[in-house]
């Protein structure tokens, strides 16, 4: 193979790699920026397309959840010292992972269980994916807050809270219209279903705490019996 042919092969490989990179960037822009922004700007129409045209993707929703977990962990280490109110020694990555997915899962099943009583049209997968997309503004708000926290002065600290607060507000805003569109409800019925969802979440949390306490007491009882037997007979 001549030097000219070698050069052509290298250029061909580089071209293919570059095309793959461009394709990946195009997908990232479309799935993680353009469409979520479209939903945020036009929530009714956006979530209607999300449901009817199957534009919402589960892997994108899960990615937003993972990104939020990553940002929560990064906040322990890299938030500016003026803003930071957390103790890095108390960081538990496993707890952060479980917390986000547990919250989204509980809200999903609580909402689904309530809306089945009110003729809701949303499926579990659709509700879960919708909640994941609703994390879009919070993710970018946390990223912006994390970056700006290292440049803010004491007098500007409130700006950090404003950024995070705006992200939470937009998340709730998207979630409200998401529930309306996913279940094809009117305003009153949607508000009623959200109140029912909150009640269902409290019930699930109560049962979860009760179950955890019961398991803890049972394990303690079994351990006590084992200790008594081992001291007497072993």
Predicted regions and their residues:
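Alpha-helical membrane-anchoring segments
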Residues: 14-18, 56-68, 127-134, 188-196
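Phosphate-binding glycine-rich loops and adjacent basic patches that engage nucleotide phosphates
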Residues: 3-12, 60-61, 69-77, 88-93, ...
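Selected alpha-helical membrane-embedding segments in polytopic membrane proteins
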Residues: 21, 26-125
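Hydrophobic alpha-helical segments
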Residues: 56, 79, 86, 137-140, ...
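Short, non-transmembrane cytosolic segments of multipass membrane proteins
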Residues: 2-30
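A short linear-motif detector with a strong N-terminal bias
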Residues: 17-19, 95, 170
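Membrane-helix interface segments in multi-pass membrane proteins
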Residues: 72-99, 145-168, 205-234
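Hydrophobic alpha-helical transmembrane segments and adjacent short intramembrane/lumenal linkers
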Residues: 108-209, 213
């Amino acid at each position: 193979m001549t030097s000219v042919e070698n050069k052509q092969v290298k250029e061909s490989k580089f071209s293919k790699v570059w095309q793959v990179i461009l394709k990946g960037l195009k997908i990232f822009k479309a799935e993680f920026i353009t469409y979520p922004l479209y939903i945020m700007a036009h929530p009714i129409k956006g979530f209607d397309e999300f449901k009817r045209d199957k534009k919402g993707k589960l892997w994108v929703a899960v990615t937003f959840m993972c990104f939020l977990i990553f940002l929560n962990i990064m906040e322990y280490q890299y938030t500016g010292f003026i803003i930071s109110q957390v103790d890095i020694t108390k960081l538990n990555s496993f707890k952060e992972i479980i917390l986000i997915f547990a919250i989204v899962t509980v809200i999903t099943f609580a909402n689904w269980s309530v809306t089945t009583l009110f003729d809701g049209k949303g499926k579990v997968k659709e509700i879960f994916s919708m909640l994941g997309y609703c994390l879009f503004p919070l993710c970018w708000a946390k990223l912006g807050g994390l970056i700006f926290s290292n440049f803010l002065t004491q007098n500007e600290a409130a700006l950090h809270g404003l950024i995070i607060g705006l992200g939470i507000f937009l998340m709730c805003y998207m979630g409200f219209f998401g529930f309306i569109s996913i279940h094809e409800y009117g305003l009153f019925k949607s508000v009623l279903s959200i109140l029912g969802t909150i009640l269902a979440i409290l019930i699930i949390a109560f049962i979860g705490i009760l179950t955890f306490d019961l398991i803890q007491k049972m394990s303690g009882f079994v351990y006590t019996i084992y200790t008594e037997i081992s001291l007497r007979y072993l």
